[in-house]
Amino acid sequence: MKKVLAIILGGGAGTRLYPLTKLRAKPAVPLAGKYRLIDIPVSNCINAEILKIYVLTQFNSASLNRHLTRTYNFTGFHDGFVEVLAAQQTTENPSWFQGTADAVRQYGWLFDEWDVDEYLILSGDHLYRMDYSDFVKRHRETGADITLSVVPIDEKRASSFGLMKIDDNGRIVDFSEKPKGEELKQMQVDTSILGLNPEQAKESPYIASMGIYVFNKKALNDLLKNNPEQTDFGKEIIPGAAKDYNLQAYLFKGYWEDIGTIEAFYEANLALNRQPRPSFSFYNEKAPIYTRARNLPPTKVLNCNITESMISEGCMIKDCRIHNSVLGIRSRIETDCVVEDSLLMGADYYESLETRQSLLDQGKIPVGIGKGSTIRRAIVDKNARIGQNVTIVNKENIEESNREDDGFYIRNGIVVVIKNAVIPDGTVI
């Protein structure tokens, strides 16, 4: 895989994941208590021995850069690296990235310097485990110019994805980006051609692009150079290439979830607790997911009732009840709290006992969840200060609300407490 260069698309402003992207780039959003979204594609690359990795981003990239620098230091791999490329304005390109393809085009001069045969284009906000070496191998065996990784999908979700039709040889003959109505119906196919049984084919009659591509180096360079007005892979480059290039589909059979929205992100995190077997597991020795080694102490649990939950390292929780929740690193939960169906991202630092007591004496709130608080169906971002006897349960069943001045948003009925928020004692949300 030394002849493959990976390019991870960090996405735009991350509006669908806001407010989690208020102070960080989308790939830097915490995941499963101790990871970040970017760890998924980078780990998949490392496991496939693809060690030349660029990450393209244009918003709030400082924390992403810091995480990647501290985590992925390929000392000893003479040409291995993970590097962030932020959008920059030049005389040739005075504007920011206009889309996924434009982002790659603007750094084409840099990618072109590498002696590689293929570019592996990845997304930074998906949860899945894939053997990219198998993906690239299939691309080479079929003699494709471009190979798309695809999944069969049901009608309910089909209009949110790029859909395609393929022939008996797996070649893509038609492609439509997020079709609606009659155009959607025309993209319906017999997915048994992918190896699904009749029942599965009936349930999932569409073939969806995962937004993961392998391009031959020359094919991508030509497409970007000859179509300067085309700025997006899914909307323009791929549909336009179907006629003149050999486009192949690669069926991915594992778990895959686009977690680019608050609701999908919340559901994917809590699904990690599902019994008896979650759809995605971080407990896989053959294909581990890597992240930064933080050297934190073990979690301390004092007289708690914890069920179906994931607790990261370095937490301190006492005399509380936790059910179907994910607790991030350095989470602190005081006595008589109830946390249910929630994602707590934890903290970036510890406060000493003296500091915490001093804050309480001044009527201020330490980092963590204060005594007697109840949190249900919520996401609490890092370093939040939740006071005592606070209730966060979306009491009025509001679907959408922007209350940034009060320290929270509501998205799809999920309360999202923003990073560094302060929620006063006795607050009811």
Swiss-Prot record:
Chain residues that bind alpha-D-glucose 1-phosphate: 162, 177-178, 209
Pathway: Glycan biosynthesis; glycogen biosynthesis
Regions annotated as coiled coil: none
Gene Ontology MF terms in the entry: ATP binding; glucose-1-phosphate adenylyltransferase activity; structural constituent of carboxysome shell
Enzyme Commission number(s) of this protein: 2.7.7.27
Gene3D superfamilies attached to this UniProt entry: Hexapeptide repeat proteins (2.160.10.10), Spore Coat Polysaccharide Biosynthesis Protein SpsA, Chain A (3.90.550.10)
Top-level EC class as recorded in UniProt: transferase
Domain of life, source organism: Bacteria
CC annotations in GO: carboxysome
Signal peptide feature range: none
Catalytic activity field: alpha-D-glucose 1-phosphate + ATP + H(+) = ADP-alpha-D-glucose + diphosphate
Keyword Transferase assigned: yes
Keyword Nucleotide-binding among UniProt keywords: yes
One Gene Ontology term from the biological process aspect of the record: glycogen biosynthetic process
Pfam families: LbH_GLGC, NTP_transferase
UniProt entry keywords in alphabetical sequence: ATP-binding, Carbohydrate metabolism, Glycogen biosynthesis, Glycogen metabolism, Nucleotide-binding, Nucleotidyltransferase, Transferase
Subunit composition and interactions: Homotetramer.
Family statement drawn from the similarity comment of this UniProt entry: Belongs to the bacterial/plant glucose-1-phosphate adenylyltransferase family.
PANTHER family cross-referenced by the UniProt entry: GLUCOSE-1-PHOSPHATE ADENYLYLTRANSFERASE LARGE SUBUNIT 1, CHLOROPLASTIC-RELATED, GLUCOSE-1-PHOSPHATE ADENYLYLTRANSFERASE-RELATED
Protein task: Involved in the biosynthesis of ADP-glucose, a building block required for the elongation reactions to produce glycogen. Catalyzes the reaction between ATP and alpha-D-glucose 1-phosphate (G1P) to produce pyrophosphate and ADP-Glc.
UniProt protein name: Glucose-1-phosphate adenylyltransferase
Organism in which the protein naturally occurs: Crocosphaera subtropica (strain ATCC 51142 / BH68)
Gene: glgC
